[in-house]
């Protein structure tokens, strides 16, 4: 497991949507390249979004096997990057860490390192107003990497991952709780164990799934409103429901997600090799729309000379109305490119 470089908290995108039903309501979309990431190319970074800026922190630079602890802010309206304060000296560089934004602050927790004990449990809070990192309580679930992070209902949540075993536990983070009690266990998740899964949040409801368990892609999919976990349709053609497309093959690990106008987008990742396709989730229908329609535009078609944009371990930003994909890895290639999906625009001929 430690030799595996794929990772999942992050995001990337491609083929345009094919309906899993016969509905043709959704347009194909177009990818637009934005200002390249100003830091070094990397994979396995962590990201969160707040106040109109996307933040990218940490990650892995394969050329020198460097684990990074820098942090950068992308001004979404201005299309430019600004370097923020690095994680403090006492915080290790890391990759495969969980992250979320909450009440105007960003949080990075857990992750993988090169040396024993291999994994981390420390939690760091970033205040953009002061450009200062502050240590919070260690993650109560213990050291791990490849966990899922999200925020709903005024709390942060982190769960699943890998600590030499595959995990399925979740914990809630309360930034206002006294030191020593900021993390509390959350019960009720009946999904499978996994590492490199993901979550996206629509209308303060988290949608959780994807990842892998012992080299098998996990196919269950859940919503969580801060109180109740609800099982949704699997992300595979696992039953006789005719609303599923025969090619309903979304399950993967080390993928990324973002939200645009109440729809969830999942892109790239590792599915028996790196991928470049993307799928859109409609929570009102509990259905996915994906990459089987030739009318849709893969990110690959706008990629530069590296020969294609298939990748895993990327990250994504989302403002709720705009979604971005950046960085990642394919073989020995590490990316610093940034793309935005314009979901309602047709590709130019």
Tell where the protein language model's regions lie, with residue ranges.
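Kelch-like beta-propeller repeat domains
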Residues: 20-349
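Sec-dependent bacterial lipoprotein signal peptides
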Residues: 1-19
């Amino acid at each position: 497991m430690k030799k595996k470089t794929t990772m999942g908290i992050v995001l990337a995108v491609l083929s345009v949507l094919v309906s899993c039903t016969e509905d043709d309501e959704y347009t194909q979309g177009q990818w637009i390249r934005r200002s390249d990431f100003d830091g070094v190319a990397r994979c396995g970074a962590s990201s969160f979004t707040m106040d109109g800026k996307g933040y990218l922190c940490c990650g892995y630079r394969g050329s020198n096997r460097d684990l990074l602890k820098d942090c950068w802010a992308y001004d979404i309206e201005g299309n430019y990057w600004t370097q923020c304060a690095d994680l403090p000296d006492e915080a290790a560089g890391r990759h495969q860490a969980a992250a979320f934004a909450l009440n105007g602050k960003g949080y990075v927790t857990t992750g993988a390192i090169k040396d024993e004990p291999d994994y981390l449990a420390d939690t760091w809070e970033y205040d953009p107003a002061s450009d200062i990192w502050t240590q919070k309580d260690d993650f109560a679930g213990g050291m791990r990497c490849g966990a899922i992070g999200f925020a709903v209902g005024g709390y942060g949540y982190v769960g699943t991952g890998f600590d030499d075993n595959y995990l399925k536990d979740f914990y809630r983070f309360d930034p206002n709780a006294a030191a020593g009690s900021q993390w509390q266990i959350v019960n009720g998740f009946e999904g499978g164990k996994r590492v490199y899964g993901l979550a996206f949040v629509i209308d303060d409801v988290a949608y959780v799934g994807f990842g892998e368990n012992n080299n098998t892609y996990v196919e269950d999919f859940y919503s969580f409103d801060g109180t109740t976990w609800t099982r949704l349709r699997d992300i595979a053609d696992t039953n006789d429901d005719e609303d599923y497309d025969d090619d309903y093959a979304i399950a993967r690990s080390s993928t990324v997600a973002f939200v645009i106008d109440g729809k969830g987008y999942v892109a790239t990742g590792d599915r028996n090799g790196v991928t470049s396709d993307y799928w859109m989730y409609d929570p009102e229908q509990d259905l996915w729309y994906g990459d089987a329609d030739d009318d849709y535009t893969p990110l690959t078609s706008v990629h530069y000379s590296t020969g294609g944009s298939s990748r895993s371990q990327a990250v994504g930003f989302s403002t709720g109305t705009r979604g971005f994909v950046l960085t990642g890895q394919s073989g020995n290639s590490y990316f610093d490119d940034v793309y935005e999906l314009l979901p309602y625009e047709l590709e130019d001929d």
